[in-house]
UniProtKB/Swiss-Prot annotation:
One of its GO terms (cellular component) is membrane. A lipid is attached at G2 (N-myristoyl glycine). Plays a crucial role in virion assembly and budding. Expressed late in the virus life cycle, it acts as an inhibitor of viral transcription and RNA synthesis by interacting with the viral polymerase L. Presumably recruits the NP encapsidated genome to cellular membranes at budding sites via direct interaction with NP. Plays critical roles in the final steps of viral release by interacting with host TSG101, a member of the vacuolar protein-sorting pathway and using other cellular host proteins involved in vesicle formation pathway. It is found in: Virion; Host cytoplasm, Host perinuclear region; Host cell membrane. It is a lipid-anchor. Keywords: Host cell membrane, Host cytoplasm, Host membrane, Host-virus interaction, Lipoprotein, Membrane, Metal-binding, Myristate, Viral budding, Viral budding via the host ESCRT complexes, Viral release from host cell, Virion, Zinc, Zinc-finger. Late-budding domains (L domains) are short sequence motifs essential for viral particle budding. They recruit proteins of the host ESCRT machinery (Endosomal Sorting Complex Required for Transport) or ESCRT-associated proteins. A motif (PTAP/PSAP motif) lies at residues 88-91. It comes from Pirital mammarenavirus (isolate Rat/Venezuela/VAV-488/1995). This is RING finger protein Z. Belongs to the arenaviridae Z protein family.
Length: 95
């Protein structure tokens, strides 16, 4: 669920990764100055999405995207496409 592309996308682009995808990390390593947190709410530290020089949680990213196409913190365009770095904790896919 969410790990496979639809048949139309695979036929159009093949098996290569689509360009413009921003990685979503489920577990970030601890940084030099402590844990990485969402720059908007400062609570979320899992499922962060990289904006230009900071991280946003999915809730804050959705809220910011509903207001504008640009980040209210750094002023750069907000990410629109997400790529998962690690697969979510679910049973392995068996066809």
């Amino acid at each position: 669920m969410g790990l496979r592309y639809s048949k139309e996308v695979r036929e159009r682009h093949g098996d290569k990764d689509l360009e413009g995808r921003v990685p979503m990390t489920l577990n970030l390593p601890q940084g030099l100055y402590g844990r990485f947190n969402c720059k908007s709410c400062w609570f979320a530290n899992r499922g962060l999405i990289a904006c230009s020089d900071h991280y946003l949680c999915l809730n804050c990213l959705t809220r910011l995207r509903s207001q504008s196409q640009f980040c209210g913190i750094c002023g750069k365009p907000l990410p629109t496409k997400i790529r998962f770095e690690e697969s979510p904790s679910a049973p392995p896919y068996e066809p």
